[in-house]
Amino acid sequence: MNILERMRAGELIFDTDPEYPSLYAEFEKTMKLVAQLNSGYHTPEEIRDLLGRIWGQPLDESVRMFPPFYTNFGKFTRVGRGVFINFGCTFLDRGGITLEDGVFIGPGVLLVTENHPEQPAVRRNVYAKPCLLYTSPSPRDS
């Protein structure tokens, strides 16, 4: 498994991992798109296009978001139909964020799926766990 697959699996990723520098290249790509998204006015279509590029998926025309929006990675966010994300949200998605159909996110929400161990000796390392948001009733409740 590569570093991204191991991260999604919840493994502790060490900062000495030979693949660790490749994460920074991905962060740089994402930060460029986020800066573009957060600069100036964009139509809803332009916002969806930029978010689709950040998240690596085409978005349904029913998805709406009010910038600014912040993320460090983006490739592990999945968004359903009818999702609304309000101003000033931050998604740290290395553990995976799934917003199922009809989810509304309020202003200033932080969805953080990654963390560092509390023990000082290994605090520079990172692990991630997934975040799932859905409306009730969800198809998962059936």
Predicted regions and their residues:
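Short acidic/His/Gly/Ser-rich catalytic and metal-binding motifs that mark active-site loops
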Residues: T113-E114, E118-A121
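Terminal amphipathic alpha-helical/low-complexity segments used for targeting or macromolecular assembly
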Residues: M1-S62
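Glycine-rich active-site/cofactor-binding loop and its immediate structural neighborhood
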Residues: E61-E114
